[in-house]
Amino acid sequence: MQTPLIDLQDIRKSYGGGDTPEVHVLRGIDLSIHAGEFVAIVGASGSGKSTLMNILGCLDRPTSGEYRFAGENVAGLDTDELAWLRREAFGFVFQGYHLIPSGSAQENVEMPAIYAGIPAAERHARAAALLERLGLASRTGNRPHQLSGGQQQRVSIARALMNGGHIILADEPTGALDSHSGKEVMALLDELASQGHVVILITHDREVAARAKRIIEISDGLIIRDSAKEDPTVQASTNPGALQAVDLRKRLSEGSEASGAWKGELVDAVQAAWRVMWINRFRTALTLLGIIIGVASVVVMLAVGEGSKRQVMAQMGAFGSNIIYLSGAAPNPRTPPGIVTLDEVAALASLPQITRIMPVNGAEAGVRFGNLDHMSYIGGNDTNFPEIFNWPVVEGSYFTEADERNGAAVAVIGKKVRDKLLKDVSNPIGQYILIENVPFQVVGVLAGKGASSGDQDSDNRIAIPYSAASVRLFGTHNPEYVVIAAADARKVHETEMAIEQLMLQLHNGKKDFELTNNAAMIQAEARTQNTLSLMLGSIAAISLLVGGIGVMNIMLMTVRERTREIGIRMATGARQRDILRQFLTEAVMLSVVGGIAGIGLALLVGGVLILSEVAVAFSLVAIAGAFACALITGVVFGFMPARKAARLDPVTALTSE
């Protein structure tokens, strides 16, 4: 005697237990079904026939008992192997059709083949042939809502046959159809049975059940009648279904992994994700808004921070990285700061490491021209100023050595002073301005340099002879600080050491002075700007986090709305990882689209800021980083909903509303 294709021994199924009453749905089912049989399982509502079908189709597991499929104990199969059985051995035909609403008839039929790893061209051709065979050649692109009930059920049958459909499990296939459509569906099932498919028909209608060769009656979870009209063993030996059984047994022994399936599944996941996003366009747009704003904020904030940093660094660097500043400082809080004298400046000038040295005597002071007033930094310098700071004069000329010796009341004004006080004067050279009510004649205008650090504006200064500043304005001959140009920018530290050694000698070993250099100041400013950029980016990242929470929220809602679709995919052979991939792909797709749109918005905002003369510097690293963060956000916040979807029970998912 040939081994039955399906063999159930003392199958029991109970629900509840613990705090809830235990309900026994199946109470010891013994059933054998051979290849090629057409079996009808008949019973009233609540008899346990649907539960039996779910166990037969590997959608559910029995509480106890033994289920052998092609001689293999199903209890020993893991979830992936059960999915393989559903995909390769079974084809489901449901009373409610259970088609995916967003997919066309062709796409619904192709679904089992996608999970089986069948190449796209082959599955397209096979699905089209099945639909043509069932009279739906002109309806391949129609969605379920565009089909009649009979047409939807035929699509469901075509889907059941896509991977061979060795065993057709039809649960009340005519229950939702009119009599004419019902007869057409039953005729199709008769035809499939005659071709060797095992057809298991679940119904409460005895007239429908009469079409089967074998009728099994079930009541209160027990088989009360099994009326086989022929010897099933004899039928199996002469029926073409025996060949299908041999093929199934062979493939089951070879393994359940479908080679190359992931490619088709990934493409299907992307296409399905795009369809869902398009169908729910408004909701998708609202979800994307959070990601778009988050990515755009991160990119723009970092671009503004980087632009500000580069601008400040360029302006500070314009003064030279070989510049050293010397000023008096207090050795401790209880003593007054030291004083740097002009004699010490002369002594320092003799050091070979120094090319130029310039004392500065300056302070903020009020400046007037006509009826206009302005606050500016007044710096008493010598004629080394343009060379030390690489700061040319664009109008007129710099004051001379003679002006310095004579304490001449002449001034070279910065660009901002020119714009504030002499904007309407075509030629400022020769004009007189009042500095602390002392008249000075403008002899030159410095080139623009911009802000050097923070709120300081280097262009808001006026250079006058050191002697004039000391006598006419400040009443002190000692410099406020000294500017020193090192001979070699690469040896600024060595130059500082030489200056410090000489100053300690001049001050009898007392370090009541301070040395700083432009390079150190630039590095300190760079650290400050980096911290500022990081702070701006962190603030912007919060909005990206909010966008991620929005993705999680929408995906949780999507899982709830599409629970039945998840059940359909599982019934057609999807593994848990396939469902996980499907919903994770949708979350990532949201993030990818949002990331791309966010980058586009950031570039647009950046363009507007540039037109508004705000320093902006986009970085490919920052853009790529923001996009990567959006992608990671999609994965992280989409994983929990996707895992929830993957862990759904197939039966529970299929019966959800």
UniProtKB/Swiss-Prot annotation:
It is a multi-pass membrane protein. Residues 6-245 form the ABC transporter domain. GO terms for molecular function: ATP binding; ATP hydrolysis activity; transmembrane transporter activity. Pfam families: ABC_tran, FtsX, MacB_PCD. ATP binds at G43, A44, S45, G46, S47, G48, K49, S50. Keywords: ATP-binding, Cell inner membrane, Cell membrane, Membrane, Nucleotide-binding, Translocase, Transmembrane, Transmembrane helix, Transport. The chain crosses the membrane at residues 285-305, 539-559, 590-610, 620-640. It is found in: Cell inner membrane. Its EC number is 7.6.2.-. GO terms for cellular component: plasma membrane. Part of the tripartite efflux system PvdRT-OpmQ required for the secretion into the extracellular milieu of the siderophore pyoverdine (PVD), which is involved in iron acquisition. This subunit binds PVD and drives its secretion by hydrolyzing ATP. The system is responsible for export of newly synthesized PVD after the final steps of biosynthesis have taken place in the periplasm. Part of the tripartite efflux system PvdRT-OpmQ, which is composed of an inner membrane component with both ATPase and permease domains, PvdT, a periplasmic membrane fusion protein, PvdR, and an outer membrane component, OpmQ. Belongs to the ABC transporter superfamily. Macrolide exporter (TC 3.A.1.122) family. This is Pyoverdine export ATP-binding/permease protein PvdT. The gene is pvdT.
